[in-house]
A protein has these predicted regions:
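NAD(P)-dependent short-chain dehydrogenase/reductase
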Residues: 134-181, 187-188, 194
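Catalytic helix-loop patch of NAD(P)-dependent Rossmann-fold dehydrogenases
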Residues: 76, 80-84, 91, 104-146, ...
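Mid/C-terminal beta-alpha module of Rossmann-like enzyme folds, strongest
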Residues: 192, 199-244, 270
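SDR active-site strand-loop-helix element
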Residues: 6, 30, 55-59, 96-102, ...
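Adenosine-cofactor binding site in Rossmann-like domains, unifying the SAM/SAH pocket
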Residues: 21-45
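NAD(P)H-binding glycine-rich loop region in Rossmannoid oxidoreductase-like domains
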Residues: 41-77, 88
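C-terminal amphipathic/interface module of NAD(P)-dependent oxidoreductases
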Residues: 229-231, 246-273
Length: 273
């Protein structure tokens, strides 16, 4: 099995690539320095020389606040770059796996979002990821669009590791408690991507995230509890902590309970550190 992985040096890529090794897949792990997905001419010239079975498109502009500041760059990567990769997938007649986000929804629901629910992103990041989804659906039927939420894991900058570092030097922190989410371990998501590569899943859109729901304050407390860190967590409202990008109030996805609970996965992740 021959696979192109874009954004392989990112948070999810660093978890996924060793799993690809474990199943004996041949893969080309790329990053923006050697494979600029926004440069259609370069992408086509390179891909004309290779044969593939899958494209796993992880490359993205993921900094939600910076997307508001650098809107052109966010759309260039998440929209145009994804469009280019969809065209390559169509040209080579291979499936493309695209990682999208719960941010394509506005957060006004009170129950987990289904794949069939109407999208309505409220920030540039969500809008750009949705535009990527739309390009893929328009260009190729052979696609797996995976929406996920609030990733953490080894090998990259993420909230969980940031809190562990913070706890080494501080005794208290204020964290919002009116944003509901489903934080997801990159290992769990990577396993589901491997399952897709194994075959049998219909093309389409999937929600893959940890089961259950929490808020940022509760999630932070759990991190400190598991690692026995003495840090007081003060719940605050998101209105008390203004940021450049609007955040949905509710970002829980209906995943059919295919993954473990967020508590179980968080504990497994932290106990190995």
């Amino acid at each position: 099995m021959k696979i192109l992985v874009t954004g392989a040096s990112g948070l999810l890529g660093q978890e996924l690539c060793p799993m690809l090794d474990s199943i004996g897949a041949q893969y080309w792990a790329t990053n923006s320095k050697i494979f600029d997905i926004t440069n259609a001419k370069m992408v086509n010239e390179i891909m004309d020389k290779v044969s593939l079975d899958y494209i796993i498109h992880l490359a993205a502009f993921t900094n939600v606040d910076q997307a508001e500041v650098n809107q052109e760059e966010a759309y260039r990567i998440n929209h145009l770059g994804t469009k280019n990769m969809a065209k390559i997938a169509k040209k080579l007649d291979v499936p493309i796996i695209y990682i999208s986000s719960a941010s394509v929804f506005d957060g006004e629901k009170l129950t987990p979002y289904k794949t069939t629910d109407a999208t309505n992103p409220i920030n540039v990041y969500g809008k750009s990821k949705l535009m990527g989804e739309e390009e893929i659906r328009k260009i190729t039927k052979k696609h797996y669009i995976i929406r996920t939420s609030s990733l953490y894991g080894k090998g990259g900058s993420n909230y969980v590791d940031a809190m562990l570092t913070y706890s080494m030097f501080n005794s208290s922190i204020s964290v919002v408690d009116d944003q509901i989410l489903c934080p997801t371990w990159t290992r769990d998501l990577s396993k589901e991507i491997i399952n897709i590569l194994s075959g049998g899943k219909e093309y389409g859109t999937y929600h893959i995230c940890s089961s259950g729901r929490t808020n940022w304050s509760e999630f932070t407390k759990k991190i400190f509890d598991i690692k026995r860190r003495s840090v007081f967590v003060q719940p605050i409202l998101k209105s008390d902590f203004p940021r450049p990008a609007k955040r949905p109030k509710f970002s829980v996805l209906d995943n059919g309970n295919i993954l473990p609970s967020w508590e179980e996965s968080l504990e497994k992740y932290l106990l190995q550190k």
